[in-house]
Amino acid sequence: MAKEAARVRRRERKNISSGVAHVNSTFNNTMITITDAQGNAIAWSSAGAQGFKGSRKSTPFAAQVAAEDCARKAQEHGMRTLEVEVSGPGSGRESALRALQAAGFTITSIRDVTPIPHNGCRPRKKRRV
C-alpha cells in the first residue's frame, strides 16, 4: 500500500501590524518569538533552528541570523512595529535587537524582563577555568 503524500498546509496571512518580540538569550542558545498583543505566536526562530550546533549557538552572530529569519517570517504576516522584551544573561541579546531594527521594524519600546530571584534557588557553582 503506497503512502499518501503528506499535505503541506499553507499558513494563512494574518494582517497584524504590531506585536511583541520576545528575545530569550541563555548561555547556550538564543530564542526569538514574535507574538501579537495577546501573546499568540506569529513567528519564531532560534540559533539551533538555523543550523548552529554546540557552542556556536551561543554566539552573537547566531542570534543575529535567528532574529533576521524570525523578522522575515513576521513581515510576511504584515507586521511593522514591535515592542521588544529581552530576557536572560546570554551574549545574543544586543545583536538580536540590532538585527530586528535592521530588518525594518519600528521598535517602540525595549524592556528587560529577566527574572531576578529575591534569594530563591541556590545558584550554580562558579566556574574555575
From Swiss-Prot:
One of its GO terms (biological process) is translation. Keywords: Ribonucleoprotein, Ribosomal protein, RNA-binding, rRNA-binding. The keyword tRNA processing does not apply. InterPro entries: Ribosomal_uS11, Ribosomal_uS11_bac-type, Ribosomal_uS11_CS, Ribosomal_uS11_sf. Pfam families: Ribosomal_S11. Disulfide bonds: none annotated. GO terms for cellular component: ribonucleoprotein complex; ribosome. GO terms for molecular function: rRNA binding; structural constituent of ribosome. Coiled coil: none annotated. Located on the platform of the 30S subunit, it bridges several disparate RNA helices of the 16S rRNA. Forms part of the Shine-Dalgarno cleft in the 70S ribosome. Belongs to the universal ribosomal protein uS11 family. Part of the 30S ribosomal subunit. Interacts with proteins S7 and S18. Binds to IF-3. This is Small ribosomal subunit protein uS11. It comes from Chelativorans sp. (strain BNC1).
